[in-house]
């Protein structure tokens, strides 16, 4: 049976981008991975999901654009069951950035054009330059290849490639865990700008509590497949759940 988290953040239904109800997953051995997840993700905010390894954070993220199909539970996007949406259109609206960037052969410009080209849409050079700028990359990257750039720069190229599909939502699964502090700050700055200037909804899984405190509007603490706390970042010290308190203490 799912447990009700300490809800310090009240999100009206009209302001919810994602409405998630009774999301459940069990392992092959029958052990619960997600235990009836209920949560609402507000429009135009950065939501951080934190918790111990194996608590189900990435599984929740993958359910939001159907990279994982839950056997039980429902996910609504703007009031519509995502199972009723064309999966390719869903993944255009709900872009995802992974921990390790994977770039295709060819130039950086070729990478950025890839998604729109699959839909028969041409991206002009000017549009590529704008997308590079959105990802905090200058025009010199246009004709470079993946072998000529750093991992941090490759992650920003992957972000620009995702933004080329004009998503309404960005899902990020530990996008800075392999990056140095400067590259991490670059990514964080880009995410905050996307929220502020484009009112983009961003859902980010991270093991770094400090990172979530820096950029998130709302924090969800996930423990053993259950959301046990939903708090504002500055209120993390007021968490009540024993497992959440232990995780926060060890992560400090």
Named regions from a protein language model:
Residues 206-207:
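H-loop/switch region of ABC-family ATPase nucleotide-binding domains
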């Amino acid at each position: 049976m799912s447990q009700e988290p300490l809800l310090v953040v009240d999100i009206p239904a009209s302001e919810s981008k994602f409405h998630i109800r009774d999301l459940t997953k069990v392992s092959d051995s029958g052990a619960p991975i997600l235990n009836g997840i209920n949560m609402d993700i507000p429009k135009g905010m950065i939501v951080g999901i934190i918790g111990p390894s194996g608590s189900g954070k990435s599984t929740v993220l993958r359910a939001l654009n159907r990279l994982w199909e839950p056997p039980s539970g429902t996910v609504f996007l703007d009031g519509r069951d995502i199972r009723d949406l064309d999966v390719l259109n869903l993944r255009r609206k709900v872009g995802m950035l992974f921990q390790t960037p994977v770039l295709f052969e060819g130039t950086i410009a070729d990478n950025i054009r890839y998604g729109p080209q699959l839909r028969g849409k041409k991206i002009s050079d000017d549009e590529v330059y704008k997308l590079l700028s959105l990802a905090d990359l200058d025009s010199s990257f246009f004709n470079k290849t993946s072998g000529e750039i750093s991992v941090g720069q490759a992650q920003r190229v992957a972000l620009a490639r995702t933004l080329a599909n004009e998503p309404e939502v960005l899902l990020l699964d530990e996008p800075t865990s392999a990056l140095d502090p400067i590259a991490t700050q670059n990514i964080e700055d880009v995410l905050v700008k996307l929220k502020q200037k484009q009112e983009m909804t961003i859902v980010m899984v991270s093991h770094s509590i400090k990172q979530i405190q820096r950029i998130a509007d709302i924090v969800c603490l996930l423990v053993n497949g259950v959301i046990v706390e939903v708090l504002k970042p500055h209120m993390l010290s007021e968490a009540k759940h024993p497992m959440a308190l232990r995780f926060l203490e060890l992560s400090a």
